[in-house]
């Protein structure tokens, strides 16, 4: 075994090495600008590849969905048949009286004719 004096000498030497290195848990060598740019480009590339892969999977799902013969619904979720005029009734709180609607139409027509 080591004596206490030898152990103290080893501890002092280790302390001196650690104190003079001044690493404080940080990397001793700083990265060059080209390394930082490379890492940035790599990160952008990886995120781009991830987006392309996600899009490819989504398009494949849509392709498979259509290939199975499933009907495609419109974005609003409605049917594909044209709507009747009676179905297009505005909400009651937004309805204008007949005079207001006619006046607005006349104003628009007058402006259009004057140009």
Curated annotation (Swiss-Prot):
Subunit info here reads: Interacts with PTH1R (via N-terminal extracellular domain).
| Annotated organism of origin | Felis catus (Cat)
* Family membership noted in the UniProt record: Belongs to the parathyroid hormone family.
| Compartments it resides in | Secreted
* Molecular functions per Gene Ontology: hormone activity; parathyroid hormone receptor binding; peptide hormone receptor binding
| Biological processes per GO annotation | cell-cell signaling; intracellular calcium ion homeostasis; positive regulation of D-glucose import; positive regulation of glycogen biosynthetic process
Give start-end positions of Basic and acidic residues composition bias: 73-106
What this protein is reported to do is described as: Parathyroid hormone elevates calcium level by dissolving the salts in bone and preventing their renal excretion. Acts by binding to its receptor, PTH1R, activating G protein-coupled receptor signaling. Stimulates [1-14C]-2-deoxy-D-glucose (2DG) transport and glycogen synthesis in osteoblastic cells.
Look up the domain of life of the source: Eukaryota
Q: Which residues form the propeptide?
A: 26-31
Q: Which InterPro entries match?
A: PTH, PTH/PTH-rel
Principal location class: secreted
Q: Where is this region: Disordered?
A: 72-106
Q: Where is this region: Important for receptor binding?
A: 51-69
One GO CC term on file = extracellular space
Q: Which residues are the signal sequence here?
A: 1-25
**Keyword tags:** Cleavage on pair of basic residues, Hormone, Secreted, Signal
Report the protein name in the record.
Answer: Parathyroid hormone
- Write down a Pfam family by its short name: Parathyroid
């Amino acid at each position: 075994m080591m004596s206490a004096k030898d152990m103290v000498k080893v501890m002092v030497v280790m302390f001196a090495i650690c104190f003079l290195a001044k690493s404080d848990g940080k990397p001793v060598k700083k990265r060059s600008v080209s390394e930082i740019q490379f890492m940035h480009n790599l990160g952008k590339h990886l995120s781009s590849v991830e987006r392309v892969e996600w899009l490819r999977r989504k398009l494949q799902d849509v392709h498979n969905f259509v290939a199975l013969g499933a009907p495609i619904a419109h974005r609003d979720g409605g049917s594909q048949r044209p709507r009747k005029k009676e179905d297009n009734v505005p909400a009651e709180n937004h309805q204008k009286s007949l005079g207001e609607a006619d006046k607005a139409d006349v104003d628009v027509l007058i402006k259009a004719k004057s140009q």
